[in-house]
A protein has these predicted regions:
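P-loop NTPase motor core
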Residues: 89-158
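Phosphate-binding/switch region of NTP-binding enzymes
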Residues: 130-193
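Pre-Walker A adenine-sensing motif
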Residues: 1-16
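Conserved P-loop
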Residues: 12-84
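Short, surface-exposed amphipathic charged segments that create phosphate/polyanion-binding patches used
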Residues: 81-88, 181-184
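Alpha-helix termination/capping residues and helix-transition junctions
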Residues: 61-64, 89, 160
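Conserved nucleotide-binding/hydrolysis micro-motifs of P-loop NTPases
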Residues: 50-52, 73-76, 101-102, 141-145, ...
Length: 193
């Protein structure tokens, strides 16, 4: 992509799976809210940290008719995943995983946790690819000394793939910014929010 500004929507449509890196959860919620507000296709919002659900339930964020809020708890995640895969393999949809950190937390204790989560994300990506659906994965993260994205609190490596679009969200004062990243995590271009 050239060094000009591009829209977030154009960046999200480059690949099926989009990694959304952030350090501030309110910036993430603002970004997700903005991106899904104009979405006409079915939306599956997997809310592991329940922040977005709280905003919807309190009326801060409008509840949309095409929005399916899922809170995987009490062992429901695998059933929820099966249902989402069945639906997105038939109809173009938007899938939001909020967040990868919460994904790790809910499955903590499972054997080979990293591989299991990578498999779930790739399974969703494969199903979404057939219908040109879009997946956004929020990741509370930072770059480590080697220039690789790691989960903010645990230091676990973040799933990486050259076919993922990477967007970094930042906040300065009261303004949110989005930057499209290259596969090596260097800055590509600023995105218009």
């Amino acid at each position: 992509m050239d060094q000009k500004k591009t829209t977030v929507q154009n960046a999200l449509e480059q690949n099926t799976t989009n990694m959304i890196f952030y350090e501030d959860s309110f910036t993430k919620i603002s970004f997700f809210t903005r991106e899904i507000s104009n979405c006409k296709v079915p939306i599956f919002y997997i809310d592991f940290d329940l922040q977005y659900t709280g905003f919807v339930k309190s009326g801060i964020t409008e509840e949309m008719e095409n929005l399916n809020l899922l809170h995987p708890e009490n062992g429901s995640f695998r059933e929820d995943l099966k249902s989402i895969i069945a639906k997105i393999s038939r109809e173009k949809s938007l899938i939001v995983i909020d967040s990868l950190n919460g994904f790790f937390n809910i499955l903590e204790g499972d054997k080979d946790l990293g591989r299991l989560i990578n498999s779930f994300v790739m399974l969703l990506s494969s199903a979404a690819n057939h219908t040109k659906s879009t997946i956004m994965v929020g990741v509370l993260s930072k770059l480590n000394e080697e220039g690789r994205w790691v989960l903010y609190n645990t230091g676990r490596s973040v799933i990486d793939n050259e076919h993922f679009t990477k967007i970094q969200l930042t906040r300065k004062e009261n303004n949110a910014f989005a930057t499209l990243l290259n596969s090596d995590n260097s800055r590509d271009s600023d995105l218009i929010l």
